[in-house]
Amino acid sequence: MDNGIFIVATIFIVNILYVTIYTVRLLLTMKGYRYLAALSSVFEMIIYVVALSLVLDNLNNIANVLAYAIGFGVGIIVGMKIEERIALGYITVNVITKEYNLDLPNQIRDLGYGVTSWLASGRDGERMMLEILTQRKNERKLYKHIIEIDNGAFIVSSEPKQIHGGFWVKQVRK
């Protein structure tokens, strides 16, 4: 294999690894996983120094710089895909039902979710408001269940910053 192609491929692959670890580490930091984030930063910096030195030692070839830049972009996508699969943390799902249905919260509770519900008033009449806390990895499954039960439901999710008490108090890891 030609040495130039080998260097370009190495720069590309090493930078994908670096940025993937960087992206996952950043997300771990934001989720509060301090020690895991710190450990991953050690590997991140080792890979970064290797990738950067390869580029700086071979600046005479524009393909090396392009491989570095493209590897950076691909690494962000790969890192985000990995984080989506890991799905760390919890989400709060707010549901506004199409119609007032007293049985809906119990149907969702029967699926293993903690649900708080109350009467809400919408433009077209009474609705039921539900608040559900679940692990992010269960988000799509929860959406599917809600839509099966109430296809016209309005669903919004957000990521809680802190959790204290309630249904999840014994299960939530700090």
UniProtKB/Swiss-Prot annotation:
Keyword Cell membrane among UniProt keywords: yes
Disulfide pattern: none
Main location: membrane
Membrane spanning residue stretches: 4-24, 36-56, 62-82
Sorted UniProt keywords: Cell membrane, Membrane, Transmembrane, Transmembrane helix
Subcellular location: Cell membrane
Pfam annotation, one family: DUF5698
Entry keyword Transmembrane helix: yes
Membrane-topology descriptor: Multi-pass membrane protein
InterPro entries: DUF2179, DUF5698, UPF0316
PANTHER family: UPF0316 PROTEIN YEBE (PTHR40060:SF1)
Family: Belongs to the UPF0316 family.
Name this polypeptide is given: UPF0316 protein Lm4b_01790
Record organism: Listeria monocytogenes serotype 4b (strain CLIP80459)
